[in-house]
Amino acid sequence: MAEKVSFEEGKLQVPDKPVIPYIEGDGVGQDIWKNAQIVFDKAIAKVYGGHKQVIWREVLAGKKAYNETGNWLPNETLEIIKTHLLAIKGPLETPVGGGIRSLNVALRQELDLFACVRPVRYFKGVPSPLKHPEKTAITIFRENTEDIYAGIEWNAGTAEVQKVINFLQDDMQVKKIRFPKSSSIGIKPISIEGSQRLIRAAIEYALANNLTKVTLVHKGNIQKFTEGGFRKWGYELAKREYAAELASGQLVVDDIIADNFLQQILLKPERFDVVALTNLNGDYASDALAAQVGGIGISPGANINYQTGHAIFEATHGTAPDIAGQDLANPSSVLLSGCMLFDYIGWSKVSDLIMKAVEKAIANGQVTIDFAKELGVEALTTRQFSEVLLTYL
């Protein structure tokens, strides 16, 4: 019988036939999702022989939702994901004009999905600008709900920004606004709770996956109390809650300035296992690391609240409207995000099967047009690529 996934006493309770919502996505979402779903279902059937099955339930967001309901992110969609805990999604178009700045950010903030998790690894055969891309194997934990992504800012020349500037200058005695008459102002909230729950999740992930080092990435040399606070609170958490693991050497927690980190992931990526970052730094680092191993077209991602069990797994690339509906898009990002979903619900054999199929296809030069051009091989369509994966399952 189809049932919802539940979360009890800090653990997911997964029935044999869980109902999992999906958002097809805009642009190439129509191409990648339908092909990925076929691969998911075949892998589940191969592993469990019909004893387990995902019941996929479509929910609306993005352009499809707007066309059908007049709302880019319907309340019904949020409620369904809240009650079902999990979802997987394709890329979403950002609405033009006022209102929601980003549907992806809105989903993360509405559901308090505080950890953006991106495992970055190299697949043999993927074109990369690096001589040794195989040395890059880093899992990113990016804080998802704070920092400048809170969207607290005021436009230059408005009465609102003038109130803020007057308060800063008159009440707080701030002297460092260089051009107060023409400045926009933004606020960067970073909290103890927000920082520590993210860093705790990163440490727990490292310990669960036999990884030793968790590195705190920050700009505390410039922003002493926000970025510096992230670093400080991370060390305090580690010493308070993981003293035994630190003492035994099972866990090492260190830190690095963000700009140096962006150098070191090119020069010595092997020195990092798991990295925890504030929101903006995490945004930069996620895409920079993805470029080292083939780009965001093959990068999976998940947005997770480890305290409630809620999680959305997603294709990390954009909508690519120039190739939408043409059966050209690489479905690997949503496929590998599906692998993260299956790992999350404890169906790791399904994840392993799909991962090995993707590895084999790429190693054999059976790739979509994004990689085929650089490898000098004939490009497969989205459908052909998924059919190749089916033969490898």
Curated annotation (Swiss-Prot):
EC code: 1.1.1.42
Binding-site list for Mg(2+): D283
GO biological process per UniProt: glyoxylate cycle; tricarboxylic acid cycle
InterPro entries on file: IsoCit/isopropylmalate_DH_CS, Isocitrate_DH_NADP_dimer_prok, IsoPropMal-DH-like_dom
Binding site for D-threo-isocitrate: S102, N104, R108, R118, R142
Gene3D superfamilies: Isopropylmalate Dehydrogenase (3.40.718.10)
Cofactors, names only: Mg(2+); Mn(2+)
Reaction(s) the record says it catalyses: D-threo-isocitrate + NADP(+) = 2-oxoglutarate + CO2 + NADPH
Co-factor: note: Binds 1 Mg(2+) or Mn(2+) ion per subunit.
Positions bearing the site annotation: Critical for catalysis: Y149, K219
Keywords: Glyoxylate bypass, Magnesium, Manganese, Metal-binding, NADP, Oxidoreductase, Tricarboxylic acid cycle
Enzyme class: oxidoreductase
Gene Ontology MF annotations: isocitrate dehydrogenase (NADP+) activity; magnesium ion binding; NAD binding
Protein function: Catalyzes the oxidative decarboxylation of isocitrate to 2-oxoglutarate and carbon dioxide with the concomitant reduction of NADP(+).
Family: Belongs to the isocitrate and isopropylmalate dehydrogenases family.
Subunit structure, as described in the record: Homodimer.
Name the UniProt record assigns to this protein: Isocitrate dehydrogenase [NADP]
Gene: icd
